[in-house]
Amino acid sequence: MLSPKKVKYRKKQRGRLSGEAQKGNKISFGEYGLVSLETSFITARQIEAARIAMTRKIKRGGRVWIRIFPDIPYTKKPAETRMGKGKGGVDHWNAPVKLGTVMFEMAGVIEELAQEAMSLASSKLPVKTMFVVRRDLR
């Protein structure tokens, strides 16, 4: 699963996401993309599940790029622990995804297969998504 090798601070405050994506909202590498229609945090496990679903569908035919990276730590205290005694340990890593962010890209396969693969990946994610083609975004 994806996670940062080294971070400046181990723990971070939750924060909030708002607005549309200013960066990462165009297809840069492939021909097809999966764009977020909602704002949310996506876990490293969800990204990995989507990646596996796509690569299994396209077999060895094409190439997949993951355009988001989980670099926000999510902490959690153990079950049945009293309040206090400091912030909990890092439970998992999240990737911030704003409306309009291109999350995955794909190339080297026909459009119908790419759409099916992206649909499978979309079902693994907690946000509504849209399949886009590079020629549509120009």
UniProtKB/Swiss-Prot annotation:
Q: Which GO terms describe its biological process?
A: translation
| GO cellular component assignments | cytosolic large ribosomal subunit
| MF-aspect GO terms | rRNA binding; structural constituent of ribosome; tRNA binding
Record-linked CDD domains: Ribosomal_L16_L10e
Q: Which Pfam families match?
A: Ribosomal_L16 (PF00252)
Which cysteines link up through disulfide bonds? none
Q: Where is this region: Disordered?
A: 1-21
Q: Does the keyword Amino-acid biosynthesis apply?
A: no
Ranges of compositional bias, category Basic residues: 1-15
- Coiled-coil intervals in this record? none
What keywords are annotated for this sequence in UniProt?
Ribonucleoprotein, Ribosomal protein, RNA-binding, rRNA-binding, tRNA-binding
Q: What does this protein do?
A: Binds 23S rRNA and is also seen to make contacts with the A and possibly P site tRNAs.
Assembly information from the UniProt record? Part of the 50S ribosomal subunit.
In the record, the note on similarity to other proteins reads: Belongs to the universal ribosomal protein uL16 family.
- Protein name per the record: Large ribosomal subunit protein uL16
Organism listed in the record: Borrelia garinii subsp. bavariensis (strain ATCC BAA-2496 / DSM 23469 / PBi)
Q: What is the lineage of its organism?
A: Bacteria, Pseudomonadati, Spirochaetota, Spirochaetia, Spirochaetales
Q: Which gene encodes it?
A: rplP
